């Protein structure tokens, strides 16, 4: 399993920045792209493992997998990967970095750090 952290505000067109800021109360919003990998380190398109996401020092806003048939509540802290991917939206709400832990059955637990809200 791998994860990359993105900050949508840095790639958002200027006309949309106010909207993003209103949604997040001016706090930083991060998108974490989670990819399930095979034993060779390649994305496993067949993987649909149930993943759980825990956040310490921040807030999980939602999980998205791109599967239109998945009716899991958006704000739940669990969701199945779809075609080997899952996206977590996290908000830092303190002056310390948030730690995001991703786990799943028969998968190594992965922890990523999200920068503090400055």
Regions found by a protein language model. Name each.
Residues 1-25:
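Low-complexity, acidic Ser/Thr/Pro/Gly-rich terminal tails and inter-domain linkers that flank the onset
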Residues 103-107:
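Beta-strand-rich extracellular modules
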Residues 24-29, 95:
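Solvent-exposed, conformationally flexible loop/turn segments
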Residues 74-94:
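Short, hydrophobic beta-strand segments
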């Amino acid at each position: 399993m791998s994860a990359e952290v993105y900050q949508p505000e840095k790639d958002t067109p200027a006309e949309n920045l106010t909207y993003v800021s209103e949604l997040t109360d001016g706090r930083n919003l991060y998108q974490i792209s989670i990819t399930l990998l095979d034993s060779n380190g390649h994305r496993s398109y067949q993987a649909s493992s149930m993943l759980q996401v825990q956040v310490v020092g921040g807030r999980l806003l939602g999980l998205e997998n791109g599967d239109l048939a998945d009716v899991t509540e958006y704000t739940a802290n669990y969701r199945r990967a779809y075609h080997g991917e899952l996206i977590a939206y996290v908000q830092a709400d303190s002056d310390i970095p948030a730690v995001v832990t991703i786990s799943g059955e028969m998968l190594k637990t992965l922890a990523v750090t999200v920068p503090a809200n400055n």
